[in-house]
Each structure stands twice: as structure tokens, then as C-alpha cells.
Amino acid sequence: MGHNQPMQSSNPQEHFVQIALDIEHRLTTPISLTSDSNQRRNQWVTIIICTILAVTGQCIARLLENYYFLHKNLSRRRGILTQTLLQVVGFPILLLPFLLHFLIKKQKQLLIFSGETSLKHLAITYSILCIYMFCQAFFSDVRNQIPYRVFTLTYTTQLLFTLIFSKYYNDIKFNRWTFISLILAVLAGAFTLYTFSAGSPIYGKKSYGYGIINVAFGAAIFFSLLLCIIRKVFEELISFCNTSTNRKQPSFVVVLEMIIFLSLVVTIILVAAVLISGEHHDMKKEMETFTKGDIAYVRTMVGQAVAWQIYWVGIVGLVFAVSAVFSNVISVCTWPIVSLLVAFLYNTHDHFDVFRGIALGAAALSVSCYIYIIHKEKSDDDDQSTS
């Protein structure tokens, strides 16, 4: 979970990016108390901003994905690797803030990829992300071959997997509020099963087998494992900075570093897969046959790439600032919002019903419970530091 550590910099402009994760018992001088108060406030601001980014990014990406499938004339089976590639190929937009940080701070080396974190965990992170992306590609192909309610119930299991992996990899302690939050998040995801798919248009019902369901389980497992391994890398970096006398606590820029380098490697692999499979020939055909025109096609693809990067900054930022569990809760609790927006924009005859209301209410309560957990932990830390 996210914790507090004294700030190493006195520049007020650095408060947003300087998010400490570890707790140490400090002397309760007026200066330290003021610093802790500012640090807590800035961490809350960061959590709020990352939550907004995660929700906004996922909503825009799914809406544009729906728009893409509604107006393409080619077979749905075409372009599955391309759609997966869009989730990572937009990373160059993060290079500008990343490089500006290095220029302004005059930083000479990377933090995560400079040998200060375990190469084993970095290798696992790369492997898990690659497997997850290919699962997403196959999952995109078979999603509508199973009833949407089956898909939703299967995919919400990622919350359970995140809970298990966080306990094993991150050694997180849970309380009753954690389980209440997760139960409400599962309900939020489960009650969207009575609505249509929030990521692509509905197709006719088809027979499905256990192999297809296993693909959905695989995507859920690897996404959960990915978040927990990323958290483990961040924890190792924090531990290194704590034991090193000449190292400041890592700032939010490590989130950009993590996303950029992971996306770079996966992009290269997926581009190679697209070229080998011949999907790059389909892109020109899709552009020519797109019912809204080639300009709309390009805007849709670019918009998805940018939206996914916004989503990843929010999700990985929440992993850095809080935990993998909270990050996944936010991801799942966005589904009812996406479902409502899709109904409003693409299916106007589909009215707001009791199931959508329950899903939205459960999502709001789930997030509120976890925010209460964070607030309570910080209050307990304050009591310990003043005692």
C-alpha cells in the first residue's frame, strides 16, 4: 500500500511528482509536521488525478473502439493485433514530459532501468506484459463468441487474482474494508452483464467452449499479475532509495519510465507480429472501406492510441501511489460508466435501467470504501508519528 516518507526536496513545484511510498517514524518537530501535511495533500491530489486519467482514458478508448467496430466493413477477425498494438504504440507522447524532467532536474541516469531494481522482476514484467497483450489480441477475437454476462463474470475474477498476487508479491495486509470494497467492485462489474458489451458492438449468439472462457481467464490473470509485479519493482526502488544516503525518493517520473520502456519493447514485438501476419495490408483496406471516411479512420486509431496511454499513466500511477489492488478496483469500477456512455452514444433506445443504477452505485461505494482505507491508514500513521 502507499505510505509516507519525508520529502527530500524543498522546491514547492516538485510536490506533485514527489510521492513517497514508505513509512518511517519521524521526529515530530513543527517543520516535519508541516512537511508531512504538505506531502499528504499532494499525494491525495496525485491519487485523484491518476483516478481521473484511468477512468477518462478507458472510457475514451472503449468508446472509440466501439466506433471503430461499428463502422468497419471488413471481417471482425481482421485487425485484432492492430487493436492490441494501439494499447502501447502511443508511448511517444510520454517522451516530452519524461525528457523535460531530465533536463530540468539535470538527472543523468534512469531509476528503474539503471540496475537499481531486480533484473529478475523486470524480466518477469516484460514477459507478463507481452503474454497479456497477446491474450488481449485473442480475447478481442473471441469476446463476442460468448454471452456478455459470461465474459463479465469471468473477467471480474481479476480482482480476486490481484488480491492473491498482492498478498504474495507485495505482502499487503487486508482488512474488512478491503474485502467490502472488492465485493462491491465485483457487483459493479457483475451488474453490467445485463447490458451489452462496453467495448465493441454485440453480434449474434454463437456456441462457445471452455477454451474461449480460458482466454478470458488468462487475460484477467496476466493483467492482475502485471500490476502486482510493477508494484514489486516500485517497492524495490523505494527500498534502494531508503538505504542509499545519496538518493532522493523516486518521483512520479518513474511511472513514465516504466510505461515508456515496457511499451517500447512490446510495440516492437507486436509490430513484428502484425507484419508477419499480414495485418498491415488490412489497414489500408479498412481505411478505404471505413464508412465514415479515411480521415475518421485515422482519427479513431490515433485517438485510441492516445487514450490508452492516458489510461496506462493513470493505472500505473495508482499502482505507484497506492497499490495494485486499488488500481484494479478503479479499472473494474469504470465498466458501468463505459456501458452507460456506450448506451447513450450508440444505442439511444437502450434506456437507463435498475441494473445500470446498481452497477454505478456499487462502483461508487467500492471506490469510497477504498478511499476510506487510505485515509484511515494515513491517520493511523499520523498518530504513530506524534506519539
UniProtKB/Swiss-Prot annotation:
Keywords annotated in UniProt: Membrane, Transmembrane, Transmembrane helix, Transport
UniProt-listed InterPro entries: PUP_plant
Localization of this protein: Membrane
GO cellular component: membrane
Domain of life, source organism: Eukaryota
TM regions (residue ranges): 44-64, 84-104, 122-142, 150-169, 179-199, 210-230, 252-272, 306-326, 329-349, 354-374
Bilayer topology term: Multi-pass membrane protein
GO MF term list: purine nucleobase transmembrane transporter activity; purine nucleoside transmembrane transporter activity
Similarity comment: family membership: Belongs to the purine permeases (TC 2.A.7.14) family.
Identification of the protein by name: Putative purine permease 15
Species of origin: Arabidopsis thaliana (Mouse-ear cress)
Gene that encodes it: PUP15
